[in-house]
Amino acid sequence: MTNIRKTHPLMKIVNNAFIDLPAPSNISSWWNFGSLLGVCLILQILTGLFLAMHYTSDTMTAFSSVTHICRDVNYGWIIRYMHANGASMFFICLFMHVGRGLYYGSYTFLETWNIGVILLFTVMATAFVGYVLPWGQMSFWGATVITNLLSAIPYIGTNLVEWIWGGFSVDKATLTRFFAFHFILPFIIAALAMVHLLFLHETGSNNPTGIPSDADKIPFHPYYTIKDILGILLLILFLMLLVLFAPDLLGDPDNYTPANPLNTPPHIKPEWYFLFAYAILRSIPNKLGGVLALISSILILILMPLLHTSKQRSMMFRPFSQCLFWILVADLLTLTWIGGQPVEYPFIIIGQLASILYFFIILVLMPVTSTIENNLLKW
């Protein structure tokens, strides 16, 4: 008799994705982040669902309802902080996952990569609208500043902003629709993640060497299920350390002040995971130029397969490209730091130089270095 997991229509899908899936025998811990992102998403949907049971999306009561969750709801405080810090863990895993893709040349799986870039945009949109919901000072002013960027679009900009706001400023209508967006987007992310996996399983996983691994495959279960469980336990450990010992470490103190349209905070800045893009936006002293640079900083990922000039897929055996990659990582950390600093000397010039370097490394230095490496190997 054939095993039910191989015949049952539903279990067959699960079996082919998580049990009998042929996986390369040498994938490292950098390949753990896909499953960790799945766990983060499930965790965010569950904690978010319980928060939504007590949250009210009205300007008069939103801030109070979040306070009520923390003070009066059974274990509301832990649910709220798991959700807030879960977003940070989500982005840490995302950045690691994308970084892995860049380092090991996983972007040559075009469909998987492009869906991944769409996923990145969707997660960023979800995090942005979610940050507005507690209706603190930074929520309100963050929403005002970021939505206002759309007014840089010629001709239709102003109308577009007012249409998104549902009025002439960020107000009750804006908060209500942002809550609706924040509720629906995670389910869209889950659907996109399934498509992402579908395309990945068409080709099979990449591996650190970048060499096809068809000759050396092992079953996903038990080898990588146990490895993923270890990753998940570590993820939960780090998340709970953050939640229980330093829940406000990554937040902004201004968001504990209720939103006040008449009082602007001294430094308007987004959550830490958007600071690198915010620094690129601020480094251009022109509104439309800044918006284009902001979008380009993420959209540039779509160009990665076109910019790949090396005859090797992975960076594992390319020391010069490795150097450039880690300079790019350092540059992104610099941009993250600058994004949280006030707009004054010397931060302005550092931000501008770091922004130029970011685009210069990706668009010029990496393709040129890859070509030089090809020539050094007489390829």
Swiss-Prot record:
Residues annotated as binding heme b b562: 83, 182
Q: Which GO terms describe its molecular function?
A: metal ion binding; ubiquinol-cytochrome-c reductase activity
Which cofactors are named for this entry?
A: heme b
Similarity section: Belongs to the cytochrome b family.
Query: Which species does this protein come from?
Result: Rucervus eldii
Pfam assignment, any one: Cytochrome_B
Binding partners and assembly: The cytochrome bc1 complex contains 11 subunits: 3 respiratory subunits (MT-CYB, CYC1 and UQCRFS1), 2 core proteins (UQCRC1 and UQCRC2) and 6 low-molecular weight proteins (UQCRH/QCR6, UQCRB/QCR7, UQCRQ/QCR8, UQCR10/QCR9, UQCR11/QCR10 and a cleavage product of UQCRFS1). This cytochrome bc1 complex then forms a dimer.
User: Tell me, which GO biological process terms does this entry list?
Assistant: mitochondrial electron transport, ubiquinol to cytochrome c
Protein name per its UniProtKB record = Cytochrome b
Read off the lineage from the record.
Eukaryota, Metazoa, Chordata, Craniata, Vertebrata
- Residues annotated as transmembrane: 33-53, 77-98, 113-133, 178-198, 226-246, 288-308, 320-340, 347-367
Q: What does this protein do?
A: Component of the ubiquinol-cytochrome c reductase complex (complex III or cytochrome b-c1 complex) that is part of the mitochondrial respiratory chain. The b-c1 complex mediates electron transfer from ubiquinol to cytochrome c. Contributes to the generation of a proton gradient across the mitochondrial membrane that is then used for ATP synthesis.
Q: What else is known?
A: Heme 1 (or BL or b562) is low-potential and absorbs at about 562 nm, and heme 2 (or BH or b566) is high-potential and absorbs at about 566 nm.
Q: Where in the cell is it found?
A: Mitochondrion inner membrane
Q: How is the cofactor bound?
A: Binds 2 heme b groups non-covalently.
InterPro entries in the cross-refs: Cyt_b/b6_C, Cyt_b/b6_C_sf, Cyt_b/b6_N, Cytb/b6-like_sf, Cytochrome_b, Cytochrome_b_C_euk/bac, Cytochrome_b_N_euk/bac, Di-haem_cyt_TM
UniProt-annotated binding residues for a ubiquinone = 201
Q: What Gene Ontology terms describe where this protein resides (cellular component)?
A: mitochondrial inner membrane; respiratory chain complex III
Q: Keywords on this record? A: Electron transport, Heme, Iron, Membrane, Metal-binding, Mitochondrion, Mitochondrion inner membrane, Respiratory chain, Transmembrane, Transmembrane helix, Transport, Ubiquinone
- The record lists heme b b566 as bound by 97, 196
Q: How does it sit in the membrane?
A: Multi-pass membrane protein
